[in-house]
């Protein structure tokens, strides 16, 4: 064994020991992590060491601070503070049962066995007896099941069906865009989920998807702390959207902003790419003596001097006040998007729609980054290991915050910067 590798092995072991002594139950978590590390094979030690050294950079918390660092006394939190008028909301098909149970088992073990918030399950067709029994057996909390009517789920009846079908068929090469059901789902989450009668009874909601994993204990009530700190919207991952899915969404958004005379919020710059304007300014300075400019074509999503950087809050996890979605301002915005037809002529996702609405209507102090939570969906995860409680994140998947497609730099910028700069 090379001395270089030996030193890195011992450094990793010491790092793991220190980390889990500080933040975790030593006996269980350290053993589990070392077993996972050994299974990777020795040739991956250096990569694994790098992943563990990749610290999350501290962010200015003037406008948004973690609700907890480490573990709170969950028994005290659950017994002393009132429950909010809140629910989990799950959109699922009967065929999603296994994935739903996996997500429920995770959130129940990490959080809801202590706080017992109810669930609302929605489907575009009736749930089977098997589905209902299985999810009821997975929790002690109350559950309600709802079916979506045509108005909430299907495309508008006054829009030509052949035109919709042709538009969707033409979106070849755009991820999920050839599936009408995917367009319907994105439209439903963008403008209709909060209108269902079962959702109208609640003030807060927490979206729960099938096949997600919560990898840290949540030892406090996010709903209570959101309310206490005057937060309206909470997220756990901020990521770049695929440009082909939203070629004109930003244009329609800025147009609506101007038509409606909406003031620019202090969060709006989170969504703006300033590199093009900086480049143009530099090129003009370099070419000022030649009498003319040779400039690149502006991006397609540029409007009124603004360019969308494709950042959005990943809405498969979000905690939000429902009066935000029920507000006149939000519904005027999504009505404008509906009239533009982008839910079928393009593949607008609900995540960028929600996010741009948040940027239009909320200030930065009203949005919370759940940096202490651990959350994984598919191969993308955020691990709250340095802030969270009893985290057990997949050992070989880097925190998305440390990857190129993350929007952490944009978030830090709008929040006042990284503290280590």
From Swiss-Prot:
Name of this protein: O-glycoside alpha-1,2-mannosyltransferase homolog 5
Location relative to the cell: Cytoplasm
Family in the record: Belongs to the glycosyltransferase 15 family.
Keyword Glycosyltransferase recorded: yes
Function as written in the Swiss-Prot or TrEMBL entry: Probable mannosyltransferase involved in O-glycosylation of cell wall and secreted proteins.
Location (main, coarse): cytoplasm
Lineage of producing organism: Eukaryota, Fungi, Dikarya, Ascomycota, Taphrinomycotina
Database matches in InterPro entries: Glyco_trans_15, Nucleotide-diphossugar_trans
